[in-house]
Amino acid sequence: MSIKVFEVLSDMNIGGAGKLLLTRMSLSDKEKFDEQVIIPRGSLLEDEFRNIGYSPVFMKYCKDRSFDIREIINLCKLFKKEAPDIVNAHGCLSARIAAYLARVPVRIYTRHCAFKPSIYMTYRPVKSAIRYFSKLFSTKIIAVADAAKKNLTDVGIDPQMIEVIINGVVAVERYSDEKNRRVRKELGIPEKAFVCGICARLEDAKGIDTLIRAARVLLRSNKDYYFMIVGTGSLKYYLKELTDALGISSRVKFCGFQKDITPYLNCFDVNINCSRGTETSSLALSEGMSIGLPCIASDWGGNPYMVKDGYNGMIYPTDDFISLADCISRIRDDRELYKTLSHNAILRYEDELTALKMTRKTEKLYEELFLTASQRAEEEAVAK
């Protein structure tokens, strides 16, 4: 008999959590698990899940929000009717509460982000309340990085409740030299340019301005650098204006949102992450590692776990654009260092960051929690 699992996600757009869930469900063991996904009506994720063979169930109220009492009522009715063995709520508090009220045996909360807790959340009474309700509503918590786990324990959650399962991605296609040259030409990249790339939302937490300021420092002494920014967001016009103001717009290309970043990653010589908030384990960094791209990342959140300084890339102090520029120039100027970092990037990816490893670890946890819950139910039945 297969284990019935409901995955609940409140995202309206296709973000990191949605991509991870799509990847994992596409690789899941269909003989062992009967999975269903619940998303908001109108979410851009609907077609993506249909493309991998799932017909989503829709929420009405939790659209890019974690809590709505009306959704608790709706989900509670659904869970009582369908009787899932496991509910995994990807940040959706309403789903956790509904699963508790519906007496779902295994209730999981997956934490996809990391951020500095507000001061009031560190007060002892608040931490005690968070600890209590976390145990009440959740059987287990999955953190997608050590940084996410620390974030949770900092606000009082019992570390024994938390299982760290690092984000994994499917390896991207590595282009041949001939195809790479053709794609670089099609994208308008100057010949012999050293391409520094970043794939991220254009929001403050992603620190794109740090890369732009580092670009100005580098271009003062060497015009061979070229910068590609893949993504869109609310800071698009501000960042373009900053690039113009610094006089480097001819060497910085804003590529916009790209559903498939494979061509861009293949054009990069180095893959950069400038996060100053929320980062746990960057999917773009992992995808770049799968084709041997050295990484340069800020020391924020989960970046230092993914990027081992001097092994598969370099770590610089968050927001320090001078240090970022120095890391870029060192990797560019030292070909032996570049080759070593590139080789180790692939090893780092294969060691822990593959989609299949993430999927199998999650399924193993599901099976263990299901077995424990089943044994507990049998013991309670005998006791009665």
Give the residues covered by each predicted segment:
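Membrane-interface segments of envelope glycosyltransferases acting on lipid-linked substrates or membrane lipids
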Residues: M1-K384
